[in-house]
């Protein structure tokens, strides 16, 4: 039985990769990577996101200047069709991932009830 659970997990991984929503994220990501300005903007977003997450994990909040930078970056992303499509595709995929997470972790929740 223990090996079987890994087989199921691998099957789930393949199923996620086959989802049209997953394929859409890949497609849009490739388009972003082919566009220098979109790619730079995406890299800037990732760096900003990592910085903010690191700050919050250490109990710090973004300064007013950093919040302004975040807002400006968000506006640039909204104005870029490829990045906008990427985040929309990510959102559609995250619905599946959220549902899968809920299903997979249901037995663990039962243990703490």
Swiss-Prot record:
- One Pfam family, please name it: Com_YlbF
Question: From the record, what ranges are coiled-coil?
Answer: none
Q: Which InterPro entries match?
A: Com_YlbF (IPR010368), YheA/YmcA-like_dom_sf (IPR023378)
The residues that cross the membrane are none
Concerning SUPFAM superfamilies, the annotation shows: YheA/YmcA-like
Query: Which top-level group of life is the source organism from?
Result: Bacteria
Instruction: Please name the NCBIfam families in this protein's record.
Output: PRK13676.1-1
Q: Please give the family membership noted in the entry.
A: Belongs to the UPF0342 family.
What protein does this entry describe? UPF0342 protein SPy_0811/M5005_Spy0626
């Amino acid at each position: 039985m223990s090996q079987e659970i890994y087989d199921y997990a691998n099957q789930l991984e393949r199923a996620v990769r086959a989802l049209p929503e997953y394929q859409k994220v890949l497609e849009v990501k490739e388009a972003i990577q082919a566009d220098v300005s979109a790619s730079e903007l995406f890299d800037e977003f990732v760096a900003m996101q990592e910085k903010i997450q690191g700050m919050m994990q250490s109990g710090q909040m973004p300064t007013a200047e950093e919040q302004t930078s975040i807002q400006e970056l968000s506006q640039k992303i909204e104005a870029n069709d490829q990045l906008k499509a990427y985040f929309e595709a990510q959102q559609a995929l995250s619905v599946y991932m959220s549902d899968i997470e809920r299903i997979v972790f249901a037995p663990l929740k039962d243990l703490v009830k």
